[in-house]
Amino acid sequence: EESVRGSGNVHVTQPSVVSITQSCETGTVYQLQEIRDIAKIAHEHAMSVHMDGARFANALVSLDVSPAEMTWKSGVDVLTLGGTKNGCLAAEAIIFFKPEMVGDFPFLHKRSGQLLSKMRFISSQMNAYVSDDVWIKNAKHANTMAKILSEGLNHFSNIELAYPTESKEVFVHLPRDVID
């Protein structure tokens, strides 16, 4: 909440969006209540909540919740649904949970160079990705493999996990002699 302290001061950049990554770059996952708490504070300060869902499916599997529970039911306004880190080739989708927020987005999308010629060939992957729960199966497999790796690494006294393994990423602290 302290991050919005400069709000209303003309000499300070005005915050307008809180962006969270689910799951995080460290492989940890925001719990639903944490998302709700962040969204509540953001909305109290007239800010939107964006979820970077580059590893969205991995977080869903980790929490064993529905997409709705982790997004709009928890206060998320916009989701960037990533497929690239879970089996797609450069495919992402932006989902606005409040239609009034779309505004000039199609024009900004084009102007920013993110609307490529023949984009439909990239976008078509998303249909296959969500069909037959491919995205969930891929995420379950990746999360399971990360857990197996974590458990195996825990058998080494000189290797320490940097973060709990809650999704598909494993980070470790290695002793200098192992690194060298």
Descriptions of predicted regions:
Residues E1-Y163, S167-D180:
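Conserved PLP-enzyme active-site core in the AAT-like
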